[in-house]
Amino acid sequence: MISTTTHSVEGHEITDYVGIVNGEAIMGANVVRDFLAGISDVIGGRSAAYEDKLAEGRQIAVREMEDRAAQLGADAVVGVMLDFETLRDGMLMCVATGTAVKLRRRS
C-alpha cells in the first residue's frame, strides 16, 4: 500500500476516489518515563522515551489507515495528514487521515 502526503502518486493516474480513511492510536505513558522526560525537558535534552512512543503511535495509526483503505479495495492513500495530541493522564494520541484511491500505472 502506498501512503503519501502528496495528492498524487508519481507514475500513476488516480482512477477512483474510494473515500476518506483514518487510523488512530491512543497509548499510555508510564510514570517513570514521564518523570525522566520531565528531567530532560528541564535540562534541555530530548526525551527518547516519548520520541519512541510517538513513532510507535504513528506506525500503528498509519497501518490502521492503510488496512481500512485495503478493505475498500484501494491501491493507495493520498493527502495523508498526521495529528498528535496529548490527552489527560499521560495518554498520547496519533491520528492518520487520508483519501483512499485506486491507481493505474501511466504508460
Swiss-Prot record:
Pfam families per UniProt: YbjQ_1
S-S pairs: none
Family statement: Belongs to the UPF0145 family.
Name this protein carries in UniProt: UPF0145 protein BH1111
Organism of this sequence: Halalkalibacterium halodurans (strain ATCC BAA-125 / DSM 18197 / FERM 7344 / JCM 9153 / C-125)
Lineage, opening ranks: Bacteria, Bacillati, Bacillota, Bacilli, Bacillales
